[in-house]
Amino acid sequence: MSPLFILLLFSSSIIAQLHSPSHIYHTERLLLIQSNLTISGTVDKVINEKDGDIHIRLKLDSCSNLLNEKNITSQHGCLVIEIICACKVTQPDAITACKNYSNTIPIPKLGDHIIVTGDYVLDKQHGWMEEHPVTKLIIQ
């Protein structure tokens, strides 16, 4: 475990509320583990989802302990990163969540190295770990 991860783990308080919950549809499907977690890695895949979010598979530089078995088997050993309301919403139950919201997070490309901050959550619907929503992203 890297010293940076240990510092982040113990300096961040765990809170029971997600960032921007009004712009996340069905928030009950996400279990907050840690707020404001900063990680880095290389973009393995970028997917525009029907709910308006952009899903990014991030191959982590370190902190592989942030992954669970579902990340290994279903996400090719990557952490899922979600930039909310960043593309066209076609999923009916997600339209309201993105209404009057303008994404300001930059969208990385395949192969980009990024530093990303967001809420580290368990997606109970899919079973894998994510950063959702991303609150800050730097493309290096």
Describe the function of each predicted region:
Residues 15-140:
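OB-fold and OB-like single-stranded nucleic-acid-recognition modules
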Residues 11-12:
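N-terminal signal peptide c-region/cleavage motif recognized by signal peptidases
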